[in-house]
């Protein structure tokens, strides 16, 4: 029966390349799913991707297996999802950081990153003693630029004479998982006088926050 089918449907979550223990975006999703399982007694399927090609494969595999809903973490799932979702009209899909797909069985979850970052910028601007603050982004995409722009606007709101140094880690998905590069960028920013750093960089942010702690400056993290 229909009700039996719904009762048996198991949700699935597909983590992005950082993996579910990235101390950031994916791990937050995993902890939320785990909490759901603990509170309801339910179970969920999961997979950690090893490479880009697996996105569509994992989506199709879970959909074929009857998983419902299928949740994805990250904008890189937009293209594979736009191909797969129409083939499984009875499956519900949800994807974080994608809000431009108009498909009846897809729920996009987007955020006003610039607004929260504006408040973060105000904090940074008020806390800085040098008048120089910095930002480390992960992959250079519009989403992360929204973080950076909101932050800079917030800094300027409390200190119009402040300097904001902004760096992106890279232009490929590897930029989310490069704590060594995050550390190097932070050291360079500190050498230019930055005494508050804001990271919106996934696993790369671990390197930013650790370096800030080691060097004795303030840091602000997000998505973790």
Regions inferred by a protein language model and the residue ranges of each:
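Gram-negative bacterial Sec-dependent N-terminal signal peptides
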Residues: 1-7
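A residue-level marker of the well-folded mature domains of exported/periplasmic proteins
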Residues: 7-224
């Amino acid at each position: 029966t229909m009700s039996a089918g719904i009762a048996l449907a198991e949700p699935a979550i597909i983590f992005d390349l950082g993996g579910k223990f990235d101390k950031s975006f994916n791990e937050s999703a995993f902890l939320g799913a785990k909490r759901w399982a603990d509170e309801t007694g339910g179970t969920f399927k999961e997979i950690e991707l090893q490479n880009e090609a697996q996105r569509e494969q994992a989506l199709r595999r879970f959909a074929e297996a009857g998983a419902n809903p299928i949740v994805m973490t990250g904008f890189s799932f937009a293209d594979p999802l736009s191909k797969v979702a129409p083939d499984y009209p009875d499956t519900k899909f949800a994807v974080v950081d994608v809000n431009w797909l108009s498909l009846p069985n897809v729920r996009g979850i987007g955020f006003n990153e610039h607004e929260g970052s504006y408040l973060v910028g105000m904090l940074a601007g008020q806390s800085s003693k040098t008048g120089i603050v910095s930002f480390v982004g992960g992959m250079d995409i519009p989403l992360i630029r929204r973080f950076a722009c909101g932050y800079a606007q917030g800094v300027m709101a409390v200190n119009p004479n402040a300097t904001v140094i902004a760096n992106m880690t890279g232009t490929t998905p590897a930029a989310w998982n490069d704590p060594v590069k995050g550390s190097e960028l932070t050291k360079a920013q500190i050498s230019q006088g930055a005494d508050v750093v804001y990271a919106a960089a996934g696993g790369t942010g671990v390197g930013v926050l650790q370096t800030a702690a080691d060097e004795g400056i303030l840091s602000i993290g997000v998505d973790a």
